[in-house]
Amino acid sequence: MTGAAASAAAPAPARSLLSVSGLDAWYGDAHILHGVSFGVPAGEVVTLLGRNGAGKTTALRAIMGLVRARGRIEFDGQSILGLAPFRIAGLGIAYCPEERGVFTSLTVGENLDLPPVVRAGGLSRRRILELFPNLAARLDHRGNELSGGEQQMLAMARILGTGAKFMLLDEPTEGLAPVVVQGIGATLRELKAEGFTILLVEQNLRFAATVSDRYYVLDHGRVAEMVPAAELAARRDRVQSYLAV
């Protein structure tokens, strides 16, 4: 199943917490997504795979109301397409962009304090630092004193105290050392065990395979493949072909 046929034929899984159907989206005047459909069941890690320019980031931005889009986007049974981004965030959806957005002039502790609480049930500071022990030792360091891996950890950590339980993570392993990537994978598995739902954008299939329950492969703005984790081994070469430059 490939191309436009997959876009139309890949239904969202039953009881999806997030359901995207027939989504078209634009980045400026460029028409990036064409009839994209996918679903994210509660408590799962779902990965959007694809090479640069496939439309993965645009899909996340469309969910957050940051780009022009049409189609259907529902969260917990409620239509969110057309809502202001702050209202979408208020539903418990948090977006961690690839550029991380760490405030470099603020300390780690100040960065952690900055995001507003949107819902009850956020993780305590103590639990957040248990998940990211590197940050515990650097609470008084400014953002510009952190390594790339530590900045990524901080960008993710800031979400956890807000009460958001649905995380959109854009390329969290991009440019990071293997040992840091392993640590991020371990943290995502812990968050999943604690009830978080995660939509992940990745090009790193080796990493995604350690955390994901299902994969949607985007190619030229369309869903080319939907692969449950149980089928990845048998279809890995085909999936990898969509990631080759």
Question: Where do the model's predicted regions map?
Answer:
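Glycine-rich phosphate-binding loops of nucleotide-dependent enzymes
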Residues: T2-A5, P11-V245
